[in-house]
C-alpha cells in the first residue's frame, strides 16, 4: 500500500507535465501500471483471475 501522503502529493497539480505519473487506483502503487485499466500488474492479475475485468481472459498456448 502506498503512503497516503504520497497519494495526496501525486494528486496535486505538478509544476511541469513530465513530473506527472500514473498510480494504481486500487492500491496506489506507482510502478507497472497498465494505463488502459488504471491498475498495477498485481491488482490486474487478481481481478482478471476473479473475472471482474470484462474482456480479459487467461491466455493459453
From Swiss-Prot:
Taxonomic lineage from the root: Bacteria, Bacillati, Bacillota, Bacilli, Bacillales
Cofactor note: Binds 1 zinc ion per subunit.
Subunit structure: Part of the 30S ribosomal subunit. Contacts proteins S3 and S10.
Gene Ontology biological process terms in this record: translation
Cited HAMAP family: Ribosomal_uS14_2_B
Family designation: Belongs to the universal ribosomal protein uS14 family. Zinc-binding uS14 subfamily.
Name assigned to this protein: Small ribosomal subunit protein uS14B
Required co-factors: Zn(2+)
Taxonomy, superkingdom: Bacteria
GO cellular component: small ribosomal subunit
Amino acid at each position: 500500500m502506498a503512503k497516503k501522503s504520497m497519494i495526496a502529493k501525486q494528486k496535486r497539480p505538478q509544476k511541469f507535465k513530465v513530473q506527472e505519473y500514473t498510480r494504481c487506483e486500487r492500491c496506489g502503487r506507482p510502478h507497472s501500471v497498465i494505463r488502459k485499466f488504471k491498475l498495477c500488474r498485481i491488482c490486474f492479475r487478481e481481478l482478471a483471475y476473479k473475472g471482474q475485468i470484462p474482456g480479459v481472459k487467461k491466455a493459453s498456448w
